[in-house]
Amino acid sequence: GPALLGLYYTSHILGHGEAVGKSSNCAHAVRCVKREFVEKRGLAPEQVMLTVCDADTYFDTQFMDCLAYTHVQNPKPYNTTYQAAETFFPNIWAVPILIRIKAIIDSVGFVGQLASPFSHPFPFAIYSQSLRTSMECGGWDVDIIPEDWHHYLKCWFKKDGDFGVVPVFMVMGNDAI
């Protein structure tokens, strides 16, 4: 059968005690994914990859292939968050010069941090991990706003420090604002 079952998204209505933001949205999405793909369709959590992104995220056409390849080649695929090489270039010529300069500096910095053997990168804005990893670490918290670092640290502590970011060197990103 096909290697990629499909791309899916969820729509989340804020519940009691939930903060507005990506973390509560991610928690909702994981509940939906577990219900639809694990409980109804019988897939194992190891067979499902989650990607967190923003509404203005653009993906390289080969990103999913590269992510899948990186995941299956990883000796510790369930102790990993995958981070793409994020840039802020889609609308770079439509923003004022100062924002353009900051977007270029940030883009170079993010890619450089991923490539550096001396850094310990944290996930930022657009990242992926297996459903199994999310379930083992307790998923995203609904009352947190900075979901990327919080969820990463939650996984890092749950796995006793045996958790890291693996770069996916496919360019993707968001609009510069």
Describe each model-derived feature in a short phrase.
Residues 166-169:
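A structural/positional concept
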Residues 53-59:
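Acidic metal-phosphate-binding loop of nucleotide-sugar-dependent transferases
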Residues 50:
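Short aromatic/hydrophobic "clamp" motif used to bind/position activated sugar donors
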Residues 3-6, 11-44, 61-145, 150, ...:
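Long helical/loop segments within the catalytic core of UDP-sugar-dependent glycosyltransferases
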Residues 47:
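Phosphate-coordination loops involved in phosphoryl transfer and adenosine-cofactor binding
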